[in-house]
Regions:
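Conserved ATP-binding subdomain of kinase catalytic cores across diverse folds
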Residues: 1-28, 75-263
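Ordered core of a single globular domain
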Residues: 40-93
Length: 263
């Protein structure tokens, strides 16, 4: 399975848009984030802390920071023994509150800065609040998960060939949280830079990765039988995608109109 995964990454890496994103992801390490996210503590040249960038990143202290750190206790217990040992080699240094993307507006998102063998050995963990699934209102008969952070973490592990070794969950303040590394080897592709063959290649890669993820988390034979050998499934996806794009443009125009009207 690992050999298949390595081959897949190598093959997809030959696609120009993906190759550029992979190069960027290779540089997205904790050591690289150290200079971006932290600063030297004034008067203490050997110590570092989060570098505030309000409102995007704000340091958290006192009882709030203590609550976040305390929540790591239950998180450690759910990690595999080797991961738990690795985490024990790091100590928490600072905590910050991070403004998250549009899909998580209004949710709590914390970052914890750890140090291992000094400032040159950093680790950044993200503790992100996870609400109920967006599907839950439409699935009244489904058994609700006991923990939304666990739901997301186990879903990622099921769909990804290799997931974040520090992926896990915790709870505090009556809320469920997902725990993962912050920006560890993450990369993205700017769609504005794509056109023609590049855009088609990118769409093909996205479709393949989505299909592989579903095949890993479900029964691939059942999925293949449901899809069949004809063009019906592909045509249905294309129709849905076009309708979704139209709805997105409509929503965006209504949002702009509301903004101009002061609503």
């Amino acid at each position: 399975m690992l050999e298949v995964g390595h081959f897949q990454v190598h093959r997809l890496g030959q696609v120009a848009p993906v190759h550029k994103a992979l190069l960027k992801a290779e540089r997205a390490t904790p050591a690289h984030a150290l200079e971006q996210l932290t600063e030297v503590v004034p008067g203490k040249p050997a110590a570092r802390r989060f570098k505030e960038d309000k409102p995007m990143l704000t340091r958290v202290t006192g009882a709030q920071a203590a609550a976040v750190i305390a929540a790591l206790g239950s998180y450690r217990e759910m990690l595999e023994p080797q991961r738990r040992h690795l985490l024990s080699l790091y100590r928490p240094v600072d905590v910050a509150f991070k403004v998250v993307g549009t899909g998580s507006v209004g949710l709590r998102d914390y970052c914890i800065y750890f140090e291992g063998n000094g400032p040159a050995d950093p680790l950044f963990l993200q503790v992100k609040e996870e609400p109920d699934s967006a599907y839950s209102p439409y699935l009244p008969d489904a058994t609700p998960p006991k923990h939304n952070g666990r739901r997301v973490a186990e879903g990622q592990k099921a769909m990804q060939l290799q997931s974040d070794p520090f992926l896990g969950w915790t709870s505090f303040g009556g809320r469920d949280y997902l725990v993962r590394q912050l920006n560890d080897h993450k990369g993205s592709i700017d769609l504005d830079d794509l056109c023609g063959d590049g855009l088609a290649a990118y769409a093909e890669v996205c479709g393949e990765l989505l299909a592989r993820g579903h095949a890993r988390s479900a029964d691939p034979l059942v999925l293949a039988g449901y899809i069949g050998a004809g063009d019906g499934f592909g045509e249905a996806l294309a129709k849905f995608g076009a309708a979704y794009a139209d709805q997105t443009e409509k929503d965006w125009n209504e949002l702009k109109t509301s903004g101009k009207a002061g609503k």
